[in-house]
Amino acid sequence: MLGITVLAAILACASSCGDPTFPPNLSARVVGGEDAVPNSWPWQVSLQYLRDDTWRHTCGGSLITTSHVLTAAHCINTNLTYRVGLGKYNLTVEDEEGSVYAEVDTIYVHEKWNRLLLWNDIAIIKLAEPVELSDTIQVACIPEQDSLLPGDYPCYVTGWGRLWTNGPIAEVLQQGLQPIVNHTTCSRLDWWFIKVRETMVCAGGDGVISACNGDSGGPLNCPVEDGLWQVHGIVSFGSSRGCNTYKKPVVFTRVSAYIDWIKEKIQL
């Protein structure tokens, strides 16, 4: 049975984690996916940057404490100004009920992030002020250090990424079923081969349902006991041939490989 890591008092920012007030519809199919139930993934955030006096969605992320968001290192450009949208469902509605925008204090990119090889694709955003939790804004659970999920374990990727390769960005939050692909399979020659490291986790690859551009940094949500959810992955990369390419599952940064690093950064 998979345990929920509380990380002592650090990650215990709420009485519970990974427990949405509004449960997701798990029959839904990001590319090939469907609209999520509003606020059913309440730790999902929209990372936005400012250009020409307009805030634009660039990546997803997961709220892991009231002050910290987990995202991908490749989402971060030190020349940009960011804000974090929490409690969001429809990105076209600025003043959406139950949502807030948080300013950013500090961004911690993994010290060994490799932009060429996409190793250590993880970052933590510290918010300028703690956010108030509600039915629409909650913290995610994260797994125990080094825990692994078996092949075909049913997880869900969520985000506002492109609805299909080179297509439009989604207006409302999407979700898609992405079963885990074990490392042995994902590292086969005709899959991802040596590009996939053991600090990564693959999911999907059926050629139908997939994450896409704009989903980067967002969570791979996996069910555990008592109806709770853990974020086991951070959307990192996919195939240059298209977002839903057969035998090219989405590759996620495996959160359980970085628990010690996460704990270190959120104590700063």
UniProtKB/Swiss-Prot annotation:
Keywords: Disulfide bond, Glycoprotein, Hydrolase, Protease, Serine protease, Signal, Zymogen. PANTHER family: CHYMOTRYPSIN-LIKE ELASTASE FAMILY MEMBER (PTHR24257), ELASTASE 3 LIKE ISOFORM X1 (PTHR24257:SF31). Its EC number is 3.4.21.2. One of its GO terms (molecular function) is serine-type endopeptidase activity. One of its GO terms (biological process) is proteolysis. The keyword Transmembrane helix does not apply. Residues 17-29 form a propeptide. Regulates activation and degradation of trypsinogens and procarboxypeptidases by targeting specific cleavage sites within their zymogen precursors. Has chymotrypsin-type protease activity and hypocalcemic activity. Cleaves TRY4 and TRY5 and thereby inhibits their autoactivation. This is Chymotrypsin-C. SUPFAM superfamilies: Trypsin-like serine proteases. Disulfide bonds join 17-141, 59-75, 155-222, 186-202, 212-243. Residues 1-16 form the signal peptide. The lineage of its organism: Eukaryota, Metazoa, Chordata, Craniata, Vertebrata. It catalyses: Preferential cleavage: Leu-|-Xaa, Tyr-|-Xaa, Phe-|-Xaa, Met-|-Xaa, Trp-|-Xaa, Gln-|-Xaa, Asn-|-Xaa. It comes from Mus musculus. Residues 30-267 form the Peptidase S1 domain. The keyword tRNA-binding does not apply. Belongs to the peptidase S1 family. Elastase subfamily. The active site is at residues 74, 121, 216. The gene is Ctrc. It is an enzyme of class 3 (hydrolase). Glycans are attached at residues 25, 79, 90, 182.
